[in-house]
Amino acid sequence: MKLNPSLLTAAGLVSAQLASALPQASSSTVSPSPSPSATPGSFVTTSGLNFVIDGKTGYFAGSNSYWIGFQKNNDDVDLVFSHLQESGLKILRVWGFNDVNQKPTDGSVYYHLLADGTATVNEGEDGLQRLDYVVSSAEKHGIKLIINFVNFWDDYGGINAYVKAFGGSKEDFYTNDAMQAAYRAYIKAVISRYSDSTAIFAWELANEPRCQGCETTVLYNWIESTSQYIKSLDSKHLVCIGDEGFGLDTGSDGSYPYQYSEGSDFAKNLAIPTIDFGTFHLYPSSWGTTNDWGNGWVTSHGAACKEAGKPCLFEEYGVTSDHCAVEKPWQNTALNTTAISGDLYWQYGDQLSGGPSPDDGNTFYYGTDDFKCLVTDHIAAINSRN
């Protein structure tokens, strides 16, 4: 999801400002914290077209929270995970990146400083130690995390943060040796902290990687080599791409998302042996399609995943209004489509110590009518199916 700052609620901004106003902690010179110890459970695996979580095979639901790793109040983090656990949601996708080109002076959280051709991982209390706590709380509450390593969009730095530090263009990121070396060093730094944690659902290459106008071989080669690298560091966890599902002949109506103009070939990329499952997103209003069109998008990807012999995760979907009326049919379609083994709505909202969590326009909040419709009732349907 590409965030729209103008849609953040005032309360959400206040919450973020309160978090960033806390005193700055130590910087990248601090030694890494030890990986949070694993609680009883098991590593997530796949079985045919299904996911297996803690020994249970079936369909699982979850959500996205780009902001949780940037919170400085541990109680807020624990509150979110306790509500996820209570509601029956099992997976949370979080930003594992927060790239900056200049070190913040206000004490705000950042993970990775990219400047003047160099890259420094922030392992301090205002850096990856915040992600440490997210992983630790997820372990305690039995929630599984998808952690990604970079953003295609400029929110929280993204690929353009690398471009500003090393030169070139966003398209160059996938093939530039210097940018890829910095990216891989960051991947290694993150994975080394959590490789033994059963809270990790999967490592994800990026949020919505695109290469507009590129041959599909550019993304393919990058996905293949990067996923191989991740597996060389950690063979215990699943690996996925984090793509939107663009570039697909199966079920195609010729509309923009099915085309290959963003440099992605969904089926070809999914066939890479070191990619364990498929990911796809759904935002009709951003793609020039209709809400009803989304049901075909879901079934098309289910068919492609079935053909590949791997499960699919309906990883992001959202609208800015009428959440229940619009998103419920998508959930039902996903739940009843072979090879779709889970869905994560965009995005989770809760009441934190400083006010409501950020609202990018697609958020709905814990305890609301929309939450009952799209979480409580959805979990009941999943439990009935499983």
UniProtKB/Swiss-Prot annotation:
Its main location: secreted. This is Probable mannan endo-1,4-beta-mannosidase A. It comes from Aspergillus flavus (strain ATCC 200026 / FGSC A1120 / IAM 13836 / NRRL 3357 / JCM 12722 / SRRC 167). Glycans are attached at residue 336. Its EC number is 3.2.1.78. It is found in: Secreted. It comes from the Eukaryota. The gene is manA. Endo-1,4-mannanase, a crucial enzyme for depolymerization of seed galactomannans and wood galactoglucomannans. InterPro entries: Glyco_hydro_5, Glycoside_hydrolase_SF, MAN-like. Substrate binds at residues 95, 207, 283, 346. It catalyses: Random hydrolysis of (1->4)-beta-D-mannosidic linkages in mannans, galactomannans and glucomannans. Gene3D superfamilies: Glycosidases.
